[in-house]
Amino acid sequence: WQFTPVTYSLPLMYVFHKLNNQPLTLLKSSFLIFMLVSGFILSSTIPVFQLPNPGGRHKVGTHTFHWVDSLRDEHFTHEDTTDFREIIVQAWFPIKDIQELEPEPYLDFIEIRGSTMAAAAGLPSFLPGYLNYVTSNSFKSTLCIEKRMPVLIFSHGITGSRHLHQAMFEFLASRGYIVFAPDHSYDANITIFPNKKIADYRSEITGHPDSVNVRKMQMETRTFDISFILDQINKINT
């Protein structure tokens, strides 16, 4: 969208030329110049970036899991007694063959995720849309090169996301590590499940009269998330 001003300015120039045999007025000329310059400035200040090359000897595969802990009620939706804790966990790992595979996008569900990201940063809702054109260095796969490899679990910060540190995960995976990174539901900026159900951010404690105990409960939820992930990894490995 950064080139939208340029895209519209070109047909406008043609229309002005067809309707007027006389030179453009100063106002019209200034408007067209403004449109052209705006497009180039936007494309320079908000570029479609690329993640750095992981640099290791392995290609990087990725797979996203949706896991539900049926033994644990959802702490953040206590009003719904039928809601169990569910999380999205993405893994990055070394793979051999990437033939006929396309790199995965940097962010999934950008049409949903973008507006939430913009609101958190106080930006216009359309601004993160360009991230839809950013790809990662990871390829969708379930075939790790070996079954036994060192495993790391990365837990993001409050309002964070598993997506924010992908360059580091790809760096590690290309060097022989398997990295699991969850979105801690309701702690993350936004968690989007495969059916597009949303877990929004609900971990704000500013001004809460019992903030210490509330945060303690949230940290316990995260601890149980990690324990649950370890159990799921063991199941995958058997």
Task: List each model region and its residues.
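Generic detector of contiguous secondary-structure segments
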Residues: H78, R162, Q166-F169, I178, ...
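Alpha/beta-hydrolase active-site loop
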Residues: Y186-A188, I192-T238
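Membrane-embedded alpha-helical segments of integral membrane proteins
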Residues: W1-H17
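Divalent metal-coordination and catalytic microenvironments
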Residues: A91, L172, I226
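Internal/C-terminal transmembrane anchor helices
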Residues: Q22-P47
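Short substrate-entry loop that stabilizes the transition state in hydrolases
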Residues: Y133-I192
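Domain-level recognition of soluble alpha/beta enzyme cores
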Residues: I41-L152
